[in-house]
């Protein structure tokens, strides 16, 4: 008897399903992957598709066979002498292939799992990563990531130019073309520029001053002079589906002394990571080295005045078909391997100064890392 992986989802939202099939569809479909003997990326891949999608799947999907859902449903109906459910159709396929053991992702439907167990199948939830090979990127994937990154850098440059060309008002707010320069306006510019480059941005962060002390505050309202403005931009390419992630922090006017010191410390934190990252290194060691550097410079982390301040998030994360993927570069142990693409995004956040974060993307190599990001890191604009 064989063991197979089973996915029932839409590949527009399910990155594992898109990774395995390279077929994009907005409605759920059935995918069965009979693994190779060594558990690698090989094996036999089968799609079970509706009449609506079967011909497109045959021409676009990177699988071994595409079967008709309607035909399997007809066979199941004859066997059961009743209208079949989706799980009856799955059973029809698996029984014909002598498959009785199934691996499913942790977010697989409980109702589907129960129905399969009632039909005598062994169903095991496979912990993430469902496809571990997703963590190490191919040359094609790195090219896709870089393509999205270049588009993001161009959009970010347009946003920074707007801030640079704005005028400082007596109340320290910024105006451009006679209108207030707001977080919403910069976000709109970023999204429009990315759309022109076939990228889609969501939850883009444009946070100024105290708002930026909360790293995931998307930001709102007027942008102000002499305060750090954090822009964290992470779109997905509409065609390739691969993400990019970049953060830059700028100040219009003159940055206070503490902000300058924070900026320099964060840049040095990145340099520490670049010197340490290579094949076989534990990401937690990289994270600790940056924390130690911040502490040595007097930038302490912990709860202060009722809120977290300092450096209280991870140094980085993998990305690809999802914005956050394994591995993590954080306090958790994760061994980095050549071919992984991770972000390097240390930050410092204090209520009396605002937030500073700088983020690049790097490829882990045998002896170090290759920085993919090319955008300049300039505080004063």
Each PLM stretch: what is its role?
Residues 1-381:
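Active-site neighborhoods and metal-handling regions in enzymes and metal-associated proteins
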